[in-house]
Amino acid sequence: MLFSALLLEVIWILAADGGQHWTYEGPHGQDHWPASYPECGNNAQSPIDIQTDSVTFDPDLPALQPHGYDQPGTEPLDLHNNGHTVQLSLPSTLYLGGLPRKYVAAQLHLHWGQKGSPGGSEHQINSEATFAELHIVHYDSDSYDSLSEAAERPQGLAVLGILIEVGETKNIAYEHILSHLHEVRHKDQKTSVPPFNLRELLPKQLGQYFRYNGSLTTPPCYQSVLWTVFYRRSQISMEQLEKLQGTLFSTEEEPSKLLVQNYRALQPLNQRMVFASFIQAGSSYTTGEMLSLGVGILVGCLCLLLAVYFIARKIRKKRLENRKSVVFTSAQATTEA
């Protein structure tokens, strides 16, 4: 189990780095990524700013079903500081339902900002960033044998994006990760984390999310990701956020460089569509949706009018029959008299 997890991680790192060195700032920063990783300059990149008045409601999007998240097994999970983020390897017994194919879990990782500065999440909703963001990475196991193979294919990956804000109380689920950060302070350090209920890392409301086609947010920026960004947020305490912002280093040796602001700048949406699994109060509709809604209302009113017409006609006919019956009975009584 441990060997296979380490092998998977090595393959993923090689695929992600491509033998090149990259950072978020400086001469190897994200402005220079396209020079070494051409796909980073393509037109379906992530993250994006999700504008809720421009999304398209899709009633066919079901609530996600995270299978096995509450029972991740008994084997310890590997936590690794790879110099870009802190990453937790996940067992393949975890998978997502509610997607076109079966996507099994591979790893999760975090993105965050730095103390005293706003922002830290990669995705934004209505131009509003949060302090951090959790990504849970899955790959299409129906079509591909490994994460590295799926990462290069359209919709080979399915990533859950959870925006994280600061709340008043400590989040016990996130503490299972954050309490071990001091064991992986420097790049390439690893430790083991006891298995825990991963479902509690997710928002309670899994039926409200946004869906779009995008990319990895780090080199090589493959445009292979079916993104699910939850509308509801998770919360951690300020103490937990500061631990995330101030514990890890992106370097192996002195002088140590604090691992902060490991989030990519927003990318243009271009011609892509963003779908929503729900209708927000006060949200606007597209022209097609408004036309469909208008036709639906018109047809509904017509059906109602027809129903009222036939009911009224039936009542009128019955009344006429009753009147004829009364007249006939009265005439018969007069004749007999």
Curated annotation (Swiss-Prot):
Disulfide bonds join C40-C221. High expression in all parts of the central nervous system and lower expression in adult liver, heart, small intestine, colon, kidney, urinary bladder and skeletal muscle. Its main location: membrane. GO terms for cellular component: apical plasma membrane; basolateral plasma membrane; membrane; plasma membrane. Residues 16-290 are extracellular. It catalyses: hydrogencarbonate + H(+) = CO2 + H2O. Its EC number is 4.2.1.1. The keyword Protease does not apply. It is an enzyme of class 4 (lyase). Its cofactor is Zn(2+). Zn(2+) binds at H109, H111, H135. Activated by histamine, L-adrenaline, L- and D-histidine, and L- and D-phenylalanine. Inhibited by coumarins, saccharin, sulfonamide derivatives such as acetazolamide (AZA) and Foscarnet (phosphonoformate trisodium salt). Residues 1-15 form the signal peptide. Reversible hydration of carbon dioxide. Belongs to the alpha-carbonic anhydrase family. This is Carbonic anhydrase 14. It comes from Homo sapiens (Human).
